[in-house]
Swiss-Prot record:
Keywords: ATP-binding, Cell inner membrane, Cell membrane, Cytochrome c-type biogenesis, Membrane, Nucleotide-binding, Plasmid, Translocase, Transport. ATP binds at residues 38-45. It comes from Cupriavidus metallidurans (strain ATCC 43123 / DSM 2839 / NBRC 102507 / CH34) (Ralstonia metallidurans). Its EC number is 7.6.2.5. This is Cytochrome c biogenesis ATP-binding export protein CcmA 2. Signal peptide: none annotated. The gene is ccmA2.
Length: 211
């Protein structure tokens, strides 16, 4: 068994004065997928934000390759691709320009061929030059997911990635995720819908400690 790369020990998250969960442990090695499930309010999004280091836990510690991670840790963030409920695309930029901007923000030289290929995989080649504000919610989600193929990050943290996707785009996402895991990447996916990929399932309603 490969050594753990991402570890969470005795994690606890609070909302105001109320504990959402506590005592949570996670240990993930290269190629691992963790599906996080649970009803609304169970803390799925909060857990992803803690794992992204965007929010400190109320309790416990997070480790990456054996080193403690603190909120906003730049070295850790360079390994993370985080996709939340909000797609994070700019409405006045085209789909293609959004990918260009994301590449530059990641410190990469934009590769036009790779960007066109990423958009085409999600069926966006015909709207690549259209302003994002003219796209449907499903198309905007697909633009956001296209970024994952362009910025190689070891850890994917995805919050309901299948939202607004049609069947073809859902299949494309499953393929993209499988490729990431086969390369030794790690993924933590909050979802209401079980993914077909092999991996552990964490149900925050039953598997995480509560007050």
């Amino acid at each position: 068994m490969a050594d753990a790369v991402l570890e969470a020990r005795e994690l606890g998250v609070r909302r105001g004065h109320c504990a959402i969960f506590r005592g949570l442990g996670i240990s993930l090695a290269p190629g691992d997928l963790l599906q996080v499930m649970g009803p609304n309010g169970a803390g799925k999004t909060s857990l992803l934000r803690v794992l992204s280091s965007l929010m400190p836990p109320a309790e416990g510690d997070l480790y990456w390759r054996g080193r403690a991670v603190r909120a906003g840790d730049p070295d850790y963030l360079a390994q993370v691709a985080y996709l939340g409920h909000v797609n994070g695309i700019y409405p006045d930029l085209s789909a293609f320009e959004n990918l260009q901007f994301a590449a530059r923000m990641a410190g990469q030289q934009p590769d036009a061929d790779a960007m066109h290929h990423a958009l085409a995989r999600f069926g966006l080649d015909r709207v690549a030059d259209a302003p994002a504000r003219t796209l449907s919610q499903g198309q905007r989600r697909r633009v956001a997911l296209s970024r994952l193929a362009l910025t190689p990050r070891a850890l994917w943290l995805l919050d309901e990635p299948l939202t607004s996707l049609d069947d073809a785009s859902t299949d494309c996402f499953h393929t993209l995720l499988a490729e990431h895991l086969q390369r030794g990447g790690i993924a933590v996916v909050a979802t209401h819908q079980r993914l077909p990929a092999e991996g552990a399932v964490l149900d925050l309603a039953t598997d995480a400690g509560s007050p």
